[in-house]
Amino acid sequence: MYYSKRVKEAMQIAYKAHDGQTDKGGYPYIAHPLHLAERCTSEEETIVALLHDVLEDAPAYYKEVVELVSKEELDALVLLTKKKKILIRPTFQKYLKML
């Protein structure tokens, strides 16, 4: 996993966003993005791996995510978001305009 200040911030957001969530097997959900991030070799890949489920699972963290990520990273996160409907919310659109 690539480590930097931004990766640490992404990790903190991911931990907060997935706090108390479990996967289908009953394991803490945070293990999934951490496992993906372990395979990454760049800062950008690592940040996207850590945050890839945050937009759909924890929309309360939109602001933190958008303030942290680059335009390219946000594009990747949007592509990975399964629930595209949440991306239409006025709050999310407002954050996109700030970029």
Regions found by a protein language model. Give the residues of each.
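Active-site helical microenvironments for divalent-metal-assisted chemistry
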Residues: 1-99
